[in-house]
């Protein structure tokens, strides 16, 4: 069974580097989940989410490299879910899963949303604190069990904190 590999990044640049590296490993932006606070999205992605620039950069090539385009595109287009009241923005497969469940985790707050996304409660509490302080959580479901360890090491090497596979 494939495993969800997650890591918490303190900066947009570090999160972008992680998304770029995951894509270079053969994953697509549709395989990558991004979670951040609404405040972080507003601060870090205000320009991209208000325009079609992110989508155009992905389609048009490598404007400034894959990283800027890919992370911005994940947060600006595709499956995205905003959980009002708890200020969480979720994009990617985790958003699709929560939307399919009627976003049941929203009633339990941020930790409930993370647990609903498949993250154990004790880890969700750690990620909750990181997201509230401006962190960006990147998650990717490994295509195979043997790839999970490689993804875990990759995220750690790129500066992620609290890297885990579930």
Describe the function of each predicted region.
Residues 2-50, 101-166:
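Cytosol/matrix-facing juxtamembrane amphipathic
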